[in-house]
Amino acid sequence: MAFAITQNCCNDASCLSVCPVNCIHPTPDEPDFGKTDLLYIDPRSCIDCGACADACPVDAITRVSRLSPSQAIYAELNADYYRDRPVDHAWGAPTFPPADIGSVSLKRVAVVGTGPAACYTATALLRQTDAAVTFFDKLPVPGGLARYGVAPDHTSTRRIGEHFRSLFVHSRVTMRLGVEVGVDVTVEELSRTFDAVVYAVGADQDRQLPLESEVVPMSARTLVGWYTGHPDVPADAVDLRGVTRVVVIGNGNVALDAARILTAPVEDLVGTDISAHALAALRDSAVREVTVLGRRGPEVAAFTRSECQALVDRTSVPVLVAGDDDLSSVLAALPLSASAAPLATAPRADEAETGDGATRIVFSFGRAPVAVRPGALDVRGSGTSDAGIASSIPADLVLQATGYRGSALPGLPFDADRGTVRNVEGRVVDSEDRPVAGAYVVGWAKRGATGGIGDNKLDAERTVELMLADSLSAATSSRRETAGRRPLFGRAGR
């Protein structure tokens, strides 16, 4: 009996290297990697050894015979991925680090940030060099989005933090927490002190919405920080008093997280890492309906299939779809692997009706937000049957979950159009695309706010490969002797 990869797959790919028969795909060398919700196990080739389950940092791999009824679909999804793919999975040529440890001149490296991208970068550096790594983070505790961006009821995904715990106490790692680069220490000071600096600062701003109203929606980023206990988000940042209907603009995974948390039975959240103030507010919450609003159709929904499936499978809160027969036909025609495929069996909803008072989640597609006004969100149809038709959705609270972008760090080149650190494949470059000596970037700050936790592993490893290549070729112009340097914060320590 084979194993199957389930909902909370992080695409970390730790399972790939331990599989003795190469039956887990797509691999980082294959075109589909980073484009699928999950990695998939070929049930025809799996030898049932369980090595992948032991290696998975988020417990996403389970023996098919032990899948719960709600997880049974993942046996089918794993098998479906290989339906038109070869059974014989050839091994690729082995790859090795580009240099011997002793020949790499990187002795002191700073990593700005402590989220997954930062941690994968440090892991690769510690494995391939003898460099000492210093983490900088403005927050008093490490973890980044793995700590403050993963929903508290996603307990398995949050275990990725445990995966990195040993890294923070590694003998060659120094932690500088509560130190904000650009405020407490400058980019220039880091450049003078370290052989290389890797910026893993993420994306901390919302993408702008072209709304016609002066009223702006609440950022879903604020809601997420509120229920995860982010130090920068006050306990009173979200006020649910008098709120019965919520509209979330956007239909990515963050939107689904917001809808799920706001409608969850409180007993489902007790015992999770949810903040105490959020739990108290949700216990008294009167929210009865959350509408997840998408400008385009379900065939291009931004959420992942696994998150949608989990929402539909939740028996405590019904999921409905607002739309006509045309929408029903579109949903019915979606392939099994499509993000919105689980909605094909969801009942239709009339947004003008509040139902019997029971809590519910409503998906609404093909409607663009126009303006927020007291008690409602004005929208305009963008589908084939209602293009340009204006309407409104009742809403006591409107949330914006339309994606994130980075903000400029003083002294570091910034691409305002993309909302990222200005870079070419991870090398920081100036306005004329010339490499900035010793400066690199990983994660969302490098490629934009796309991809999950595991996507940052391959991203970080590729940037580290560039660092090693630059070190060997002397492309970095800062080969200063460390003996004459003065530490930024006195003696090294944690």
List the model feature ranges, each with a label:
Residues P142-A196, A341-G357, V362:
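N-terminal Rossmann-like dinucleotide/flavin-binding domain of flavoprotein oxidoreductases
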